[in-house]
């Protein structure tokens, strides 16, 4: 026997029930009871759209952080008031991007540098002084010793240059190494006479 086609036959909630047991009053309630999850989502989405951010979770997180900090755009006005959502987005994002680096990033860097400069350097210098056990007089002596050593080195270097010149002047024909070997500057024998002459 053929049953007449019923509107509710395809619905999941009516599959296990005979047609007689399905009451029209219960149908409306069961639909409402099953939909609260979906309606809750749509309500949240509706709120999000009012804020000017439809559907993007990352943008919503940014907006939530702005609300925690104290609304930056207008404290009493909702963001989407009188403007379409597409116009509200570009204004909120650049402002947030401009303000955050100015507030957070730069001062932290400056604070860190000043803290390092003031705190660490005196501690380090005090520790060094304690390790060395040096007084101001000893420090002056060390500085004097260092300057003397540098002067002596300069004198030795200058004298070394003069000694080399004196050797050439004294013994112009003294042998200075392997000149006949190939690979030495001058190609070996080609410039032998030029090296031996003290002044050209």
Swiss-Prot record:
May be involved in transcriptional regulation. Keywords: Nucleus, Phosphoprotein, Transcription, Transcription regulation. Residues 37-50, 65-80, 96-107, 115-154 have a biased composition (Basic and acidic residues). Belongs to the TFS-II family. TFA subfamily. The lineage of its organism: Eukaryota, Metazoa, Chordata, Craniata, Vertebrata. Residues 20-36, 51-64 have a biased composition (Acidic residues). It holds the Pfam family BEX. Residues 1-200 are annotated as: Disordered. InterPro entries: TF_A-like/BEX (IPR021156). Coiled coil: none annotated. The modification Phosphoserine is found at residues 30, 65. One of its GO terms (cellular component) is nucleus. It comes from Homo sapiens (Human). It is found in: Nucleus. This is Transcription elongation factor A protein-like 3.
